[in-house]
């Protein structure tokens, strides 16, 4: 039953999700997002500055609001029949909390998708796509200009990378994502959100730790766009 529902959801994902989302999609993966390395290298060749924000949401899958999710699925064009089947999977969920002082009474669970369920990744991708559309990033001028398009974000499920050619542009992108994600119950994990810049920093006012390198997927990205560290790392791993 779950595989049938997943196949149905995959059809909507293929239609609704943009190319920048590579998470849990057939024929896509982290290798697509590792293109960040080459973007940096090419940008540095043309003396361009580039700024990255590697976003981490606090307990992203656990914070999906069920009521908002059903409304979002409807707005994304998913049929009432399919949404009803999905709602039934989550209906009547209850839990208790056991502490040193005893066990609480049962209470209803209204948030979170099952992380071990094959449907969860599909549901989260559609949930995230909804609020990412609200950010207007697909229409924003901020980003990395290539010969054919403007790229300002790359995603693998809840792992989101924002990119721009100036610190002000990056700050603008980050604030838009922060505001819209909070509207659907997702919050940025500031301690785990990293900022990386290959250009000068004048008046940095963005939440997140400044780093000179970052592991994205299985590859190491550095501010200088040098692959030597990545090669050495893989040699050590054998």
Regions found by a protein language model. Give the residues of each.
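Nucleotidyl polymerases of mobile genetic elements and RNA viruses
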Residues: 1-238
């Amino acid at each position: 039953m779950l595989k049938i529902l997943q196949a149905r959801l995959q059809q909507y994902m293929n239609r609704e999700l943009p190319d920048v989302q590579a998470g849990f999609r057939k024929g896509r993966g982290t290798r697509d997002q590792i293109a960040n390395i080459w973007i940096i290298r090419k940008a540095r060749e043309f003396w361009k500055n580039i700024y990255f924000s590697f976003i981490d949401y606090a307990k992203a899958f656990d914070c999906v609001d069920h009521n908002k999710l059903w409304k979002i699925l409807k707005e994304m064009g998913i049929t009432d029949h399919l949404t009803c089947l999905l709602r039934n999977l989550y209906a009547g969920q209850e839990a208790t909390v056991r502490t040193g002082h005893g066990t609480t009474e049962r209470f209803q669970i209204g948030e979170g998708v099952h992380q071990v369920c094959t449907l969860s990744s599909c549901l989260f991708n559609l949930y995230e796509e909804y609020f990412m559309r609200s950010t207007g990033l697909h229409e924003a001028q901020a980003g990395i200009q290539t010969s054919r398009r403007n790229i300002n974000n790359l995603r693998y499920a809840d792992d989101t990378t924002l990119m721009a050619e100036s610190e002000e542009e990056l700050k603008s992108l980050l604030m838009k994502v922060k505001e819209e994600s909070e509207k659907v119950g997702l919050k940025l994990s500031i301690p785990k959100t990293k900022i990386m810049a290959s250009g000068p920093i004048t008046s940095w006012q963005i939440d997140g730790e400044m780093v000179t390198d970052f592991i994205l997927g299985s590859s190491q990205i550095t501010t200088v766009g040098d692959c030597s560290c990545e090669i050495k790392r893989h040699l050590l791993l054998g």
